[in-house]
């Protein structure tokens, strides 16, 4: 990451990761080489499933690194669970128990956000993000599910939400 970039900007970190894996994006968030539109989701907050604690977005942009005598700095493995805020993610209400407690207990206390649009910056409240500035003045509406690509994404998220925290290493 360049010194001029803010380490808390997870989008800049994501762009670097995409370049490193050889996947370039064109305007509109589409992957070059793939002509299908990929629905975008905004990261609300992240929970470390090992400890059951919420992580700040700054921690996800640059995870801690431990020295290794053979390879230099090595990023230790960390299981994370991405939580989306809003009523448009009903399949994410099903959770599995994890090391430090149950995510269902934390989720039961979460208020629903005003819409499914979340700010990319760290939210004012740790549980509910601000709206994106462009969305102010316009009502936020959920788009109807028409695309098989979106259905695939939803199915993948269902599978991910039911197994990530349940894995044991």
UniProtKB/Swiss-Prot annotation:
One matching Pfam family: C1ORF64
GO cellular component assignments: cytoplasm; nucleus
GO biological process: positive regulation of intracellular estrogen receptor signaling pathway
Single Gene Ontology MF annotation: nuclear estrogen receptor binding
Induction summary: Up-regulated in breast cancers.
Organ and tissue specificity: Expressed in breast tumors with a higher expression level in estrogen receptor-positive cancers.
Assembly description: Interacts with 14-3-3 proteins.
Role this protein plays: May regulate the transcriptional function of androgen and estrogen receptors.
Protein name (Swiss-Prot/TrEMBL): Steroid receptor-associated and regulated protein
Organism expressing this protein natively: Homo sapiens (Human)
Record gene name: SRARP
